[in-house]
Amino acid sequence: LPHAELQPDHPDSHPDSHPGTTSVPHRDSRADLAHPMVGSPKSSRAGHAAPASDEPLAERAAQRIAEESQAVVEEITTVIEGKPEVARIAVLVLLAGGHLLIEDIPGVGKTMLAKCLAAALGARQHRIQFTPDLLPGDVTGASVFNQATSEFEFRPGAVFTQVLLADEINRASPKTQSALLEAMEERQVTVDGTTYPLSEPFMVVATANPVEMEGTYRLPEAQRDRFLAQTTMGYPIAGAEVRMLDAQTGPVREGDREVVDSVRARTTPEAMAQHIRDVRRVYASPPLLEYVVRLAEATRTHPQVTLGASPRAAVHLVRAAKAHATMDGRTFVEPQDVRAMIMPVWRHRLHLTPQALSRGAGAGDLLDQVLRTTPVS
């Protein structure tokens, strides 16, 4: 694998902007990699009726998921002006059954995005303000002695909800940050030897300030790896900021306390839980899975990388690609889905060497290079 010297990160760069990422021979076209009739589970089971949950996703179901997801995105953007791509990432991460990390400076709408997502889903939500004195039991729950019954009773923590907003997660100690690990990966919490399952769906939307800011701790690698995707908000464009100022400083409807109260539920948690299960049925061909493995291997063996994409990162990329395909109304994954999702899914997991960082290179530069030099098939 050739390794050209990395150049400084360009925030406007996109994997699809590099011609090398789409240059493949005609015989190895997307149809060979993506079409569900090529080696699909359904064709290999001819004559054997499989359970409904094992069947490939029907086109009608995919269209329904796409329409409902778009309605949620549009509802979020009624408050988060000018950021449809960020709202889309948030909904996509939910459909992929993952968790979202939003890293940016204070005051750009990270918390508002999480609140709008929960409101548009009609989901229960809890918010934890992470501070240095926050304890793990505040997150997961604890056993409390009940004097009336002379027994210990479990008092659930904030994770017992459907959308958990972990606000400024990197202001708490690493011990408290790690309290979320089991909940994020296993969808359960173990306290005093007893395991308690979490709700469906369950999604953590964590906000984090840049680590250079005062009073922040770096998120442990194990926790960063459990976030399916990472995104940033950025400053709004001028026109969107004007509309935001008008909405947030003008009168509110009677009964509303803040602007997020105007967000309407466009779906239900039960429907989204079913959509999450349906997305897992989107077809990804063996050649496409091999392409993802080659991409992961390229990051692991790159001389300017100290920590490449983990097997969990590869799993998350395939799940995100499936959700991306479904939001486009398709029932199978194409290479373009993988390329579209590799940045938000892998960028926050990679560690570059000090030499690469000293030249101003970033993880996005490395992923651009990997996409250019890794053949699709």
PLM region spans:
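Canonical AAA+ ATPase core
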Residues: 146-151, 172-176, 184-267, 272-282, ...
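C-terminal engagement/docking regions of AAA+ P-loop ATPases
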Residues: 3, 24, 35-59, 63, ...
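AAA+/P-loop NTPase substrate/partner-engagement loops
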Residues: 120-148
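Walker A/P-loop
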Residues: 94-131
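Walker B catalytic acidic pair
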Residues: 104, 167-168, 179
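Conserved alpha-helical scaffold flanking the Walker A/P-loop in AAA+ ATPase domains
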Residues: 89-92, 145-165
